[in-house]
């Protein structure tokens, strides 16, 4: 783009200088013709009479010719100076315009570079913030995982201690059909198991209050008793323990085998047919009341 602009300016200068060059040549030619024109010869009869005057006239003529020559030279030099001044002014304007465009391009380049650096800096900042957040999230997840592992280890340790405590209170033979009991601990253990079996569905808080234990202690004891086969059941999300006998479990297993694939919702709707959730104490009271009514009627 700069080369094209310089070429156009050069062509304009050449077109402007050519007419001036021809005009100057014509002026110089005229001046040379005027200088080269011979002086007019006076008649002979006037030579003797006006010899002194002729000499006097020649002097002004010569001086006039020299003055005209100097004027022509001055005019020519003045024209050349004007041409040179005009050409220099055009070149100066072209140089200024070129310098201005260069400065504008430099300013635009610096602005683009500053914008690019700012964008890169902002992207680096976002990347650093994202990396820090990822590290914080990973650290938090690792912390929660370690806390969960520690909690599980603590619960397992407490359950193991509770199991050892209960295991020390009774022993089971190889077949698991007989128990050796020592003192009142066996009575307490039997009461705990029978209470759960009779209630069928017992809140853990009520169970803890009944035996003067903490809720976590009740959970640990139930887990220990399940591990040795004394209890079988499930804990729901409402804090209740539901006792399920082996007969009821076998009935559910047989139903699943007969039906094949069974959904959980369907099995839950049919579970009431196999699992009795009514307390046995209430059944016993109902049977006793019915027996008393029959006796009174008879």
Curated annotation (Swiss-Prot):
Transmembrane annotation, as ranges: 3-23
Pfam families per record: DDRGK (PF09756)
Keywords: Endoplasmic reticulum, Membrane, Transmembrane, Transmembrane helix, Ubl conjugation pathway
Record SMART domains: DDRGK
Compositional bias segments (type: Basic and acidic residues): 101-155
Stretches the record annotates as Disordered: 31-155
Entry's family note: Belongs to the DDRGK1 family.
PANTHER family per the UniProt record, alphabetical: DDRGK DOMAIN-CONTAINING PROTEIN 1
Protein's recorded name: DDRGK domain-containing protein 1
């Amino acid at each position: 783009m700069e080369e094209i602009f310089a070429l156009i300016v050069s062509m304009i200068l050449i077109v402007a200088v050519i007419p001036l060059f021809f005009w100057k040549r014509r002026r110089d030619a005229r001046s040379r013709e005027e200088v080269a024109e011979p002086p007019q010869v006076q008649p002979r009869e006037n030579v003797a009479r006006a010899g002194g005057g002729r000499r006097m006239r020649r002097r002004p003529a010569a001086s006039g010719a020299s003055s005209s020559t100097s004027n022509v030279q001055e005019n020519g030099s003045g024209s050349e100076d004007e041409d040179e001044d005009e050409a220099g002014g055009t070149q100066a304007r072209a140089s200024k315009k070129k310098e201005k465009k260069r400065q504008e391009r430099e300013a635009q380049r610096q602005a683009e570079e500053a914008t690019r650096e700012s964008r890169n800096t902002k992207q680096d900042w976002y990347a650093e913030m994202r990396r820090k957040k990822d590290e914080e999230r990973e650290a938090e997840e690792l912390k929660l995982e370690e806390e969960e592992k520690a909690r599980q280890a603590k619960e397992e340790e407490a359950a193991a201690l509770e199991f050892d405590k209960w295991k020390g209170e009774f022993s089971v033979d190889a077949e698991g059909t007989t128990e050796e009991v020592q003192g009142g601990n066996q009575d307490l253990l039997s009461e705990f198991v029978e209470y759960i079996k009779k209630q069928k569905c017992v809140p853990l808080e009520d169970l803890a209050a009944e035996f003067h234990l903490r809720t976590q202690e009740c959970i640990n004891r139930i887990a220990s008793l399940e591990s040795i086969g004394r209890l079988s059941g499930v804990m729901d999300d409402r804090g209740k323990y539901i006792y399920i006998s082996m007969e009821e479990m076998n009935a559910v297993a047989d139903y699943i085998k007969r039906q094949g694939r069974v959904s959980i919702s369907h099995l839950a709707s049919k579970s009431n047919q196999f699992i009795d959730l009514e307390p046995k104490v209430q059944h016993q009271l109902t049977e006793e009341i019915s027996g008393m009514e029959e006796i009174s009627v008879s």
